[in-house]
Amino acid sequence: KTINYDVLRRIDKNPGLSQRKLASKLGYSLGKLNYCLNALKDKGLIKIKNFKSNKNKIRYIYLLTPAGISVKTKLTIKFMERKIKEYDELAAELKKVKTKQ
């Protein structure tokens, strides 16, 4: 699920990135990203559309569908809840250490 979240978040920020640049920014192989993009497309979370970047070259743009936006929002909330819990646990641990001194 982290992979899906990373890809959805990055697509939302910059839908016109090439697969190669997107894979590089995420630290994934091109094959892994391609597999993930196709899975997200099959789930109806993204649309992949063609556009011409110049006269000779066709590129793709990756767009979140309403379902993709919903999933990204839910994953963002879970991510933030997990980070808040980690912060609270670290703060409690730090408090224990300080009181022992």
Give, region by region, the residue ranges found by the protein language model.
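Short, cationic-aromatic polyanion-contact patches
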Residues: K1-I3, S18, K49-T73
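Key DNA-contact positions within bacterial/archaeal DNA-binding proteins
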Residues: R20, G31
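Alpha-helical residues within the helix-turn-helix
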Residues: S24, D42
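Amphipathic alpha-helical dimerization/coiled-coil segments
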Residues: V71-Q101
